[in-house]
Curated annotation (Swiss-Prot):
GO CC terms in record: cytosolic large ribosomal subunit
Gene Ontology terms, MF aspect: structural constituent of ribosome
Similarity section: Belongs to the universal ribosomal protein uL30 family.
GO biological process: translation
UniProt key word Disulfide bond: no
Protein name listed in UniProt: Large ribosomal subunit protein uL30
Subunit structure as annotated in this protein's UniProt entry: Part of the 50S ribosomal subunit.
Species of origin: Leptothrix cholodnii (strain ATCC 51168 / LMG 8142 / SP-6) (Leptothrix discophora (strain SP-6))
InterPro entries: Ribo_uL30_ferredoxin-like_sf, Ribosomal_uL30_bac-type, Ribosomal_uL30_ferredoxin-like
Superkingdom of source: Bacteria
Gene: rpmD
């Protein structure tokens, strides 16, 4: 069995004052408050979401 790769992201800036689509992307990644972390499956879709809001999140 192969183990699926994961990526851990943390919200480091507040999405207040950002575009609605960026706030929706933050929520889609499972992030709520500043410094909250989420462990996600490493897929192209998730990578694209991280790239879109790279100024708000940090990959750990």
């Amino acid at each position: 069995m192969s183990e699926k790769k994961t990526v851990r992201v943390a919200l480091v800036r507040s999405p207040i004052g950002t575009r609605e689509s960026h706030r929706a992307t933050v929520r889609g990644l499972g992030l709520r408050k500043v410094n909250s972390e989420s462990v996600l499956e490493d897929t192209p879709a998730v990578r694209g979401m991280i790239n879109k809001i790279s100024y708000l999140v940090k990959v750990l």
